[in-house]
Curated annotation (Swiss-Prot):
The gene is ldh. It comes from Corynebacterium diphtheriae (strain ATCC 700971 / NCTC 13129 / Biotype gravis). It is an enzyme of class 1 (oxidoreductase). PROSITE patterns: L_LDH. The lineage of its organism: Bacteria, Bacillati, Actinomycetota, Actinomycetes, Mycobacteriales. Allosterically activated by fructose 1,6-bisphosphate (FBP). Beta-D-fructose 1,6-bisphosphate binds at residues 157, 172. This is L-lactate dehydrogenase. It comes from the Bacteria. It catalyses: (S)-lactate + NAD(+) = pyruvate + NADH + H(+). Homotetramer.
Length: 318
């Protein structure tokens, strides 16, 4: 990986998620230059103009431009938000056929322009497509990151905060596994304002049913939002901006992303949601949480669900 001096990001895909991410990135002043690529060039021109007008009020000046794949050569991060959007009633895994070919075309174009930074993937199903980007790019897996369960974990923290009247920043709780229907909460290591949820469950067994309901609302939130407004955008846009900030500023912060496993949780050769330490080089290391037997059972089911789909496109070597 060559030494990339600047803080340039290339965003591929300026739909609802991409534009929300661009707005968050510009508003936070994270990068020097944001180049945006999209097939709808007229709409892209309008978004670039609109974002540049807002830079006046941002914390620092970010150059926003209509990009081409040539911009990837000196980019620190390429963020992929392109692909078919999830429709009402459609699961994320059902998107895979539509989006796999799109990923192949995008990665081929990026790599043809000597990109040597970090890939950040948000297109769904994100775990499967992050694996695809890794395979198609030929990069070391540490340099390919998926948004994973960063949004799911944020939703869970928000909903727990509403339940306990505590700021989400004072809640430490992860959703892991597939970014989708088989994900799971890790209540055994969760804390609310420093208080162990495991201990609370031991004191009050009836609390488990309430927490499971909160988790189900978390898991199904995307369906509710899509049914109401057509797509999710702001939450994932801000989550992607957070991951980008961790990369650009070499923060060594643990975030729940889609990371490649090499034996952690007993799993190999799969991208799946788990906490991982993020820095300028990508994923520094995967954080393997200590799971209860029941949590591990659910995690294995989630991994097997992803692997079943993954192997249709990338059969395991004999």
């Amino acid at each position: 990986m060559k030494n990339i001096v600047g803080n340039k990001v290339v965003l591929i895909g300026a739909g609802d998620v991409g534009v929300a991410y661009a707005y968050a990135l510009v508003n936070q002043g994270t990068v020097d230059h944001l180049a945006i690529i999209d097939i709808d060039e007229k709409k892209l021109e309008g978004n670039v103009m609109d974002l540049n007008h807002g830079v006046v009020w941002a914390s620092s000046r970010t150059k926003v431009s209509k990009g081409t794949y040539a911009d990837c050569e000196d980019a620190a991060v390429v963020v992929i938000c392109a692909g078919a959007a999830q429709k009402p009633g459609e699961t994320r895994l059902q998107l895979v056929d539509k989006n796999m070919k799109i990923m192949k075309s995008i990665v081929d174009n990026v790599m043809a322009n000597n990109f040597d930074g970090i890939f950040l993937v948000a297109s769904n199903p994100v775990d499967i497509l992050t694996y695809a980007v890794w395979k198609y790019s030929g990069f070391d897996h540490h340099r390919v990151i998926g948004s994973g369960t960063v949004l799911d974990s944020a939703r869970f923290r928000y909903m727990l905060g509403e339940r306990y009247d505590v700021a989400p920043s004072s809640i430490h709780a992860y959703i892991i596994g597939e970014h989708g229907d088989t994900e799971l909460p890790v209540l055994s290591s969760a804390t609310v304002a420093g208080v162990s949820m495991r201990r609370q469950l031991q004191k009050n067994p009836g609390l488990e049913e309430e927490l499971e309901k909160i988790f189900e609302e978390t898991r199904d939130a995307a369906y509710t939002i899509i049914d109401a407004k057509g797509s999710t955008s702001y939450g994932i846009g801000m989550g992607l901006a957070r991951i980008t900030r961790a990369i650009i500023h070499n923060q060594e912060v643990a975030l729940p992303v889609s990371a490649y496993l090499e034996g952690q949780y007993g799993q190999e050769d799969i991208y799946i949601g788990t906490p991982a330490v993020i820095n300028r080089a990508g994923i520094n290391r995967v954080v393997e949480l200590e799971l209860t037997a029941h949590e591990m059972e659910r995690f294995i089911h989630s991994a097997n669900t992803l692997r079943e789909v993954q192997e249709k496109f990338f059969p395991p070597a004999n």
